[in-house]
Amino acid sequence: QQDYTGWFDF
């Protein structure tokens, strides 16, 4: 699931 920062939430 992609986060708003462009990273991914684990």
UniProtKB/Swiss-Prot annotation:
The modification Pyrrolidone carboxylic acid is found at Q1. It is found in: Secreted. One of its GO terms (cellular component) is extracellular region. Isoform 1.2Y4 differs from isoform 1.2 in not being sulfated. Keywords: Amidation, Amphibian defense peptide, Hypotensive agent, Pyrrolidone carboxylic acid, Secreted, Sulfation. GO terms for biological process: defense response; regulation of blood pressure. The modification Phenylalanine amide is found at F10. Expressed by the skin dorsal glands. The modification Sulfotyrosine is found at Y4. The keyword Secreted applies. Belongs to the gastrin/cholecystokinin family. Hypotensive neuropeptide. This is Caerulein-1.2/1.2Y4.
